[in-house]
Curated annotation (Swiss-Prot):
Boundaries of every Macro domain copy: 1-173
Highest taxon, organism lineage: Bacteria
Residue ranges the record marks as coiled coil: none
InterPro entries noted in UniProt: Macro_dom, Macro_dom-like
Family: Belongs to the MacroD-type family.
Transmembrane segments: none
Lineage of the organism: Bacteria, Pseudomonadati, Pseudomonadota, Betaproteobacteria, Burkholderiales
Pfam families: Macro
PANTHER family found in the cross-reference section: GANGLIOSIDE INDUCED DIFFERENTIATION ASSOCIATED PROTEIN 2-RELATED, MACRO DOMAIN-CONTAINING PROTEIN
CDD domains: Macro_OAADPr_deacetylase (cd02908)
NCBIfam families named among the record's database cross-references: PRK00431.1-6 (NF001664)
Protein name: Macro domain-containing protein in gbd 3'region
PROSITE patterns to which the protein is assigned, alphabetical: MACRO
Length: 173
């Protein structure tokens, strides 16, 4: 996939009309603050029930991994819940865990024959991952994963805040 298939928008990921939106989830999968809470709130109880079923069968989702559920009431029919790392100074494998969250989301989308995805800025909110570093990792990891998933036609980075939007726009222009 070439660079023109990556784009950035400033907005609300819960309104994206794509095949799947990615949720910056916590390992318990039961919703939280920020984008996680917004997605659970907008998608309704079907998302929470699907997450609870995953939690009951596999005990949640480890950091760097991803699981897929229904999109509930969202415009996107699926939600991929990716668990990014909490920033702990950068010497606890955070870079690779963040890259894996993006890579595993792409792999899961490809396995489910999805073509258009939207990502939030994973780990840059309450998890405090440095935004510039996270943007570099996210773009590189997505490009790497897309090389092995040619069926994916479009990836949109949906930035809720001005700083992330500026960082992604600079890197993708």
């Amino acid at each position: 996939m070439s660079g023109e298939h990556l784009q950035v928008v400033h907005g609300d990921i819960t309104r994206m009309e794509v095949d799947a939106i990615v949720n910056a989830a916590n390992s318990g999968l039961l919703g939280g603050g920020g984008v996680d809470g917004a997605i659970h709130g907008a998608g309704g109880s079907a998302i929470k029930e699907a997450c609870r079923a995953i939690r009951d069968t596999q005990g949640g989702c480890p950091t760097g991994e991803a699981v897929i559920t229904t999109g509930g009431h969202l415009p996107a029919p699926y939600v991929i819940h990716a668990v990014g790392p909490v920033w702990q100074g950068g010497d606890q494998g955070e870079d690779e865990l963040l890259a894996n969250a993006y890579r595993n989301s792409i792999r899961l989308a490809a396995q489910h024959h999805l073509r258009r995805l939207a990502f939030p800025n994973i780990s840059t909110g309450i998890y405090a991952f440095p935004r510039e570093r996270a943007a570099d990792i996210a773009i590189a990891a997505v490009r790497e994963a897309l090389a092995a998933a040619p069926e994916i036609e479009q990836v949109t980075f949906v930035c809720f805040d001005d700083e992330n939007y500026r960082l992604y726009r600079e890197r993708l222009s």
